Amino acid sequence: MNKTIKVIYLLMMLLIVNTCVAFAQSEEKNTQTYNWQAFDIGPAEDYNYAFDANSIKYARNEDGSINKNIIIYQEKKTNNVPMSTEFNYYSITKCQLNIEQTAICFGDESFYTKKDKFRWTDTPMYLTWITVSRDSIGGLRFIQIVEYARAHDDILTSRA
């Protein structure tokens, strides 16, 4: 009987510690300053997409020169469907566009609550360039990022 009580006590302590850790992690705030610019992807979509105008920049080559064919930026995806399990969350994904190949590469995707509390990050198993079609949602986002980069070339160059 004495061992049973000790085991129950140990399990209860582990449960309390795990609960405290989970709450502590959920309280971390997303403190970065963003300047979200919404993508116009048309009506009847379940998600809103936006890019951070504060983070967009050109990539650098290995020799340190600026590569204007690769654009690095962060993208925010928010669910519009109130009955969805994703409705109370949004994600921020690190992205790269390859203008020459009309392709996109998705990096780490971090999830937050609507109140900007960090929840978790998904890291891709491998990074790959995905060709986008101009008629798709990805293609519309691609075109708008490239147009923004061309209109703000000096800003992107200074951030590279």
Per-range role (PLM):
Residues 1-9:
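Bacterial N-terminal signal peptides that target proteins for export
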Residues 23-160:
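N-terminal secretory-pathway/extracellular module detecting exported/lumenal segments
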Residues 9-19:
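Bacterial N-terminal signal peptides
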